[in-house]
């Protein structure tokens, strides 16, 4: 009977260790910056891994009051590019911890 308890304690320690490692990885990911770009860097959007926008740069030559739609499209492209990069990095970084776990 004690043998089973020791095994359970060992598993719990492993789970706690994995949780700490995962929290560390998440924290590092949250601090990392991701830059999304649209068409020759006419618009760039910088986010942190927790999806907080830190910067948005729009080149002057793309600002045309007669074509606001194009500028809006470029901003959307840059933001989406950054978010895709964050998602891929998140999966690569945290996926090893959640692989095979239901609901993750």
From Swiss-Prot:
NCBIfam families, per database record: DNA_YbaB_EbfC (TIGR00103)
Family per similarity comment: Belongs to the YbaB/EbfC family.
Taxonomic classification: Bacteria, Bacillati, Bacillota, Bacilli, Lactobacillales
GO CC terms, sorted: bacterial nucleoid; cytosol
Function of the protein: Binds to DNA and alters its conformation. May be involved in regulation of gene expression, nucleoid organization and DNA protection.
Keywords per UniProt: Cytoplasm, DNA-binding
Subcellular location: Cytoplasm, Nucleoid
The protein's name: Nucleoid-associated protein EF_2780
Subunit structure: Homodimer.
Principal subcellular localisation of the protein: cytoplasm
GO molecular function, one term: DNA binding
SUPFAM superfamilies according to UniProt: YbaB-like
Keyword Glycosyltransferase included in the entry's annotation: no
Species: Enterococcus faecalis (strain ATCC 700802 / V583)
